Amino acid sequence: MKRQALTLIPLLGAAAAQSGPYGQCGGNDWSGATTCVSGYVCVYQNEWYSQCVPGTATSSSTTLTTTTSATTRTTTTTTSTTSVPSSTNFPSASGLNFTIDGVTDYFAGSNSYWISMLTNDADVDLVLDHIASSGHKILRIWGFNDVNTEPSTGQVWFQKHQGGVSTINTGQYGLQRLDAVVSSAEKRGIKLIINFVNNWDDYGGMSAYLNAYGGSTKTDWYTSATIQAAYRTYIKAVIDRFIDSPAIFAWELANEPRCNGCDTSILYDWIADTSAYIKSLDPLHMVCIGDEGFGLDEGSDGSYPFSYNEGLDFAANLAIDTIDFGTFHLYPGSWGVSYDWGNLWAITHGAACATAGKPCLFEEYGAPSDHCAIEVPWQTTAVSSTGIAGDLFWQWGDTLSTGQTHNDGNTIYYGSDEYTCMVTEHMERIAAR
């Protein structure tokens, strides 16, 4: 939801003679190409993953740019220097369920795109106190905030794309805001889904990359080597900060990735390649896509969301080894279907996940009004559906030091009557199963 750049070439496929830029070129059980196209060299990442990166056989370094405030610093770092996380007590997929802190169950939660943009730590703590008191265990947040020009002092931004250069802001109004959220979540036992880019233009999105590095379409974004290099530089910067954190539920590729009119191979290759890259940096935390669940034959009624028009194949993407669980969203009002239809959407995705042997997370759902009457039946269906292991409504609302958080029509405010039906009573239904 919330709608209002490295560049990557798609993988050439396991049967190709050479792997493309940033493609996999080796690893345990790898049966594909073991050499790279011209200008790229196969570099060992770990025992199960080697990758084609720019350079020759004698060079395997990339240039990263970071900033702590107004000062830009350029450093050269060997590819994939991220250390393996030291803890194994991280959230995980257990059959068709999730395990959190040793408990395997169905888990509820919510979304808060805005919490990582807050500049008052007390507000962050307040919100997470309320979430912890609700019984929720999972919170999905924005891990991106892309800009093309540096905002005025005091404005939060995470990555600037300008003049063909990616600058990562690690300062007070940069990734230190994510630090505050992760630290607060750790203290309260909340687990975070952190995503890396937005399909939509809010907070920059993929358009910020295209503006800086060239291209005009989503296909360009997914297949540009320059854009994907910047994207991966950012991924690594975030993972490096939180690789040992027990508060990370999963790393998420994007918010609602789409490629309208594209062959499904475009997104499939990007998902496979990017998720493998993330696993090479952090093999212990889970990885998910963040998609809406489009492109599914099983149980389809022929409506638009089941089609492959947005370039997604839910079952094929879910089957990728380096994707730990499925995600799907639900917005009937935006998709031209009825609210009751939402129950079919949930059931069919649960069934697809059960077939794949992986859990599904009902990651976003919302309606602009009548939340209890419309959304509680979706929650009830999700809890009773095999293959669905948790749900996160869109979105959490609260009252901060500056007033109420943004109400996009879908917002459920802490302590409201709708909070009672959507959160308190939902947690009771989960406990009573």
Curated annotation (Swiss-Prot):
Could you tell me the EC number(s) of this protein?
3.2.1.78
Q: Where is this region: Thr-rich linker?
A: 56-82
Region spans: Catalytic: 83-433
Xref: SMART domains: fCBD
Which intervals hold domain CBM1?
A: 20-53
Which keywords does the record carry? Carbohydrate metabolism, Glycoprotein, Glycosidase, Hydrolase, Secreted, Signal
Positions of the catalytic residues: 256 (proton donor), 364 (nucleophile)
Task: Glycosylated residues: list them.
Answer: 97
Show which residues constitute the signal peptide: 1-19
Q: Name one GO cellular component term.
A: extracellular region
Question: What sort of enzyme, by top EC class, is this?
Answer: hydrolase
Checking Pfam families in the record gives:
CBM_1 (PF00734), Cellulase (PF00150)
Instruction: List the catalytic activities from the record.
Output: Random hydrolysis of (1->4)-beta-D-mannosidic linkages in mannans, galactomannans and glucomannans
Q: Which InterPro entries match?
A: CBD_sf, Cellulose-bd_dom_fun, Glyco_hydro_5, Glycoside_hydrolase_SF, MAN-like
Per the record, the domain of life is Eukaryota
* Chain positions recorded as substrate binding sites: 142, 255, 331, 394
| GO MF entries | cellulose binding; mannan endo-1,4-beta-mannosidase activity
Q: Where is this chain primarily localised?
A: secreted
A Gene Ontology biological process annotation?
A: mannan catabolic process
The record's function comment reads:
Endo-1,4-mannanase, a crucial enzyme for depolymerization of seed galactomannans and wood galactoglucomannans.
What family is reported?
A: Belongs to the glycosyl hydrolase 5 (cellulase A) family.
User: What protein name is recorded for this chain?
Assistant: Probable mannan endo-1,4-beta-mannosidase F
